Amino acid sequence: MAAYVVFMRDETLNPVELEKYSADVDVSFEGHDVTFLADYGTIETLEGHAIEGAVILQFPDMAAARAWYRSPEYQEAAEHRFRGARYRGFIVEGL
């Protein structure tokens, strides 16, 4: 069953760190079966507070999503994201 990783950027803290994250994150997808469904496109807030951006990634299942997120390559890149902005992120299982 497909699983989706969703990241919502609430607030940018350090644009330089986000640039480093963007430069480093692509290598983390190598060897993982991932499909980008949304990548910082236009957002219309329907409920709650507005966000700056969102990413939605599709993986074959929860285990594959976790394997990518926990990979050393992603965790190394994510350090820049953690310093660069406030995000919320989660994995949700599809139907």
Walk through the language-model features, giving the residues of each.
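C-terminal structural segments of small proteins and small subunits
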Residues: M62-F90
